[in-house]
Amino acid sequence: MGINLGHDGGAALVTPNTMIAIGEERLNRTRYSPGWQAAMLYCLRAAGMRLTDVDLVVVSNFGRFQATPAETGLAHLGIRDDRIRILDHYLSHAYTAYCLGPYDIATVLVTDGAGNNTDTETFYLASHSGIERLGGNDPGRGRHGGIGATYEAFTEHLGWHAQEAGKTMALASYGDPSAYLAPLFDVHDTRVYGRLEETHARGVAAFAAATGFDFGPVGSRGDDPRGVDAAAYLQSQVEQVLCSLVQAVISVTGVSDVCMAGGVALNCVANDKIRRLPGVSGLFVPPPASDRGQALGCALYGLHRLTGELPRRPIVTDSFGRSYTDEEIELALNRDPRSGLVERRFAPFTWHRESDVAACAAQMLASGRLIGWFQGGSELGPRALGNRSILADPRSTASRDALNDRIKHREVFRPFAPAVPEAEAARWFDVNGPSPFMLLAPAVLDAARSRIPGVVHVDGTARVQTVDPLVSPLFAALVEHFGALTGVPVVLNTSFNDHEPIVETPADALATFQAGELDALFLGDYLVEKI
């Protein structure tokens, strides 16, 4: 069992035959929530196990000092100290990056806001024999000079939560990166030296004062052109330093297949540039690359310690949650209190079992309707990939705008992602292989841009999800049906939420459906529509 004590808390259970994981926020419905108790119970129930069946509990935390077994709070559950291991935060990320990846031997790079000690960037050589740390940032340089902490600081300056770096990345495409010319980072050998001298927004203010730059007022949230240019400057500088760092660590390891993890590895724009670097043969980033994957990395480490063999679990899906039965879905549809349904807004609805949900959903999308799509087990990472999704027609900006105005209520500069059959992707996007986790942002091909404007960002890119029918047969069938109806085998895909964690249970999905303005909801084989 793996547990993350920090923000984005959660639990994971790994056995020789299965992996189950979930974030605490999906269960208590509080974004970025710490905690692990509900997540642990969820994992045990999904596996049909008791806590006494667990051989080892591995814990990581966020902070300068690692937790001790006594500080974990596990003793009150009857877990003795000799069944508890404490794992370094960055090593947990490294286990997630390598063990879930496709490469037998890999260079592993972890770039996060912070971990234990003063880590901000670390790199490893990973193979079947183990994961060996080869280097990292200068321990004498505080975390304020790290890539992740710098990105967090600018994100806070712009007025968002430090964990909302994706907003800064999206805003960056609207700005001019050359508006500010001083370098934000230097790389010496394999060490990064950032120019900020403090963390958080105050570090940006001090840097601006020292350089004479005007990044606009704190909290501009994209409404001030100086802040927009600041986002563009930051993103450009981060792309440059990451590319330099990847090439530097490859020169040390001698291995050109790269696995990356840590919150910075969710920067899909930078990832797309890294995969094109000379000397990079392959790039893998696990979908729960941020601290959402900490518990899973801990559990993988624990299995390694128990068996003596490094677990290799190459993934093709981010579905680490459990599926829900028809009986559980019907409890919610019947408003049974046992379903956990909390109706934020009462909206009468009708429901029935649909014989072909993929074809029915595709027909609705083709007619311009916005739908919720709830299937199988939930995704662990921050992106909905066809299990907990809201879907729309990408052929016009009208669906995109309606989605923002009526349901998502988010910043207009943030793009929506396209889902496309893997076999069709190269006809629409500048890709040369699968991109199943929305962790690359390639260019949309010129001939395709006018056909799918709802998913094209202002810079002509898109955060692509390729769909493999062998991995996600139902979602693939939906996209293929939509393509047959419209001639465009691309569907707009975004996470099923509205300023809340992604929905986990049928009751969560139904409550969000009632509270918002979705036209229809597909819960497994059931179609739900408002009266």
Name each model-derived stretch.
Residues 175, 181-236:
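Active-site cores of enzymes that catalyze phosphoryl transfer or operate on phosphate-rich substrates
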Residues 40-46, 55-63, 478, 486:
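Short HxH-centered metal-ligating active-site micro-motif
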Residues 233-258:
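Phosphate/ATP-binding catalytic cores across multiple sugar-kinase/actin-like superfamilies
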Residues 40-55, 246-254:
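Phosphate/pyrophosphate-binding loops at sites that engage ATP/ADP/AMP, CoA/4′-phosphopantetheine
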Residues 4-31, 72-86, 91-94, 98-198, ...:
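Flexible beta->alpha loop and helix N-cap segments adjacent to enzyme active/binding sites
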Residues 50-64, 254-263, 372:
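Short glycine-rich phosphate-binding loop at a beta-alpha junction
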